[in-house]
Amino acid sequence: MSIMKKYIHNWDELTAEQQAKAKEQFKGNPGLNASVVHPAAKFFEEHKWVKIDRFIDRNMANLLYHHVQLEAARLNYLEEKNIEYSGDTYGIFNDTQAPGDFSKYGDPIMDTLLSLSLEQMQTLTATELVPTYSYHRLYTTGTELERHSDRPSCEISTTLCLGYDNSNVDASRYPDWDWPMYIEEKDGTKLPIHMKPGDMIIYRGCDLKHWREPLWGKNHAQVFLHYNEKGGEYDIPYDGRPLLGFDASFRSEESLTRQNKLDKDLQERQAKEYVTENKVIDTSKKVIY
C-alpha cells in the first residue's frame, strides 16, 4: 500500500481535494514527511520500479555467486551419473522460463537474505510487506527471458545481481559489457537497466512487463526476492509455506487454491493488454560453466 494508505484505509475513495488536504494535515508525521521518506520510495511510487546500487556488498555477492555455481555443478554431476535426486532439494534444469539453466526455489540462504532484507525493502518502497519466496538462477550463453509479467506472489519483486562471467565477450569492442534487464513502463517506454554484482532492481512485477535479450556471456547469476503488500489482495506469507527455507512441496493446499484463483484473475486482466504466443520449449540442460 502507498504511504498514505497505511494511515487512511479508504484513501482510494477520497477525492483529489480530500487527499491533498489529508497530506497537508499529516505533514507533521515523520512517517509521511517527504523530508524523511527515502528518495527511492518516491521514485518507486511514481514509476513502479527503482534501481538500488550495492544493495549488498561485492564480497557477499561474490560468495552467493560461487554458491550458485557450486549448486549448478552439483546438480550437473547428479544428472551425468544418473543419480536420482529431488528437484526441490537440488534445483532443476527444466524451468520453462529459462530452459536448460539451473534454477532453485526457496533455498535457505536465499530465503534468509529475503527475510533480512525486509526492513530495508519497506524503507525503499514505503510499503508494509510480507516476504513470500526467493528464487535464483544461473543463466548461460544464449538464454533469453521473454517479455512477461509475474504471478501475484511476486507483487513487489527484486532481481539482485550476484555475479557473472563475461570473459568470452570481446572487451575491445564491448568494454564493461553487462546483461541489462528491460522494463516497459506504463507509457510504453522500454528501459534497459544495467547491474553490477550487488546491484538490485525493485519492481512491481505484476504491473510491468520485463525481459532480457539473449545473454552473450558465459554465465550470469541472479536471485529474485519476492514480497507482497501486507494486508493486500495478494497477502500470502511465505508463499503458503509454514516457514521460509522450505521447498515448494510445503505450500499448503489452502494457499495453492487461493493462489491459483489469483493467478487466473491476474492472467485474465493481463490478457486484455498483451498478446502472448504458444511456443514449444526445449528444456534440455545446457552447458554448465
Predicted regions, residues:
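Short proline/glycine-enriched turn/loop segments at secondary-structure junctions
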Residues: 212-217
